[in-house]
Amino acid sequence: QNHRLLERHTIFDNVALPLIIEGTHHKQIEKRVHGALDKVGLLDKVKCHPSTLSGGEQQRVGIARAIVNSPPLLLADEPTGNLDPELSMDILRLFEEFNNHGTTVLIATHDLGLISRMKYRSLTLKDGRMSQDPLAEATL
C-alpha cells in the first residue's frame, strides 16, 4: 500500500503538511503535530523518514496527517488493508476516539468481521444497493 508519504521528509514534516498549507503558525504546528503523533503512538518517530517505518507505522502517519487539522469528517478507504488483526483493531479504536471527540468517521472496507465488532451504525453496499447492517436492523 502506498500511504502517499513524502519520502525525503521526516515524519514531522509529513504530518505538518496540511497545517503548513493552511498557514498555521510554527509553534501551533509543532504542538498539533506532536499531539497527532502521540495519538497514533508514533511520537518517538518524529525525526524518522517514512522508509524506516513498517507498513503499519506508515499507515498511522497517514492517519496522523489526516487528523492533525481536526477535520469535521474523516474518510478512510480500506484503512486496515494488509494489516494484522491486532493493528487493525488499534486503528479502529483510534477512529472511535476521533469520533468521540467530534469527528465523523466514514470507513469503506471489505472486512465486515472487523467492522461488526464496532458499536456504531454500519451500512452495507451489495450489488449496487445500500442497506443497513442486518445486526443493526435486528436491534432497531
Q: Language-model features: where?
A:
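Conserved ABC ATPase signature
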Residues: H49-L53, E57-Q59
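A short, proline-enriched helix->beta-strand linker immediately N-terminal to the Walker B motif
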Residues: V68-P72
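Hydrophobic anchor residue at the start of the ABC signature
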Residues: I63
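Short coil-to-helix segment of the ABC ATPase nucleotide-binding domain corresponding to the Q-loop/switch region
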Residues: H9-A16
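ABC nucleotide-binding domain "signature" region
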Residues: Q28-V40
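Helix N-cap at the start of a conserved alpha-helix in ABC-type nucleotide-binding domains
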Residues: P85-L87
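Catalytic Walker B motif of ABC-type/P-loop ATPase nucleotide-binding domains
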Residues: L74-D77
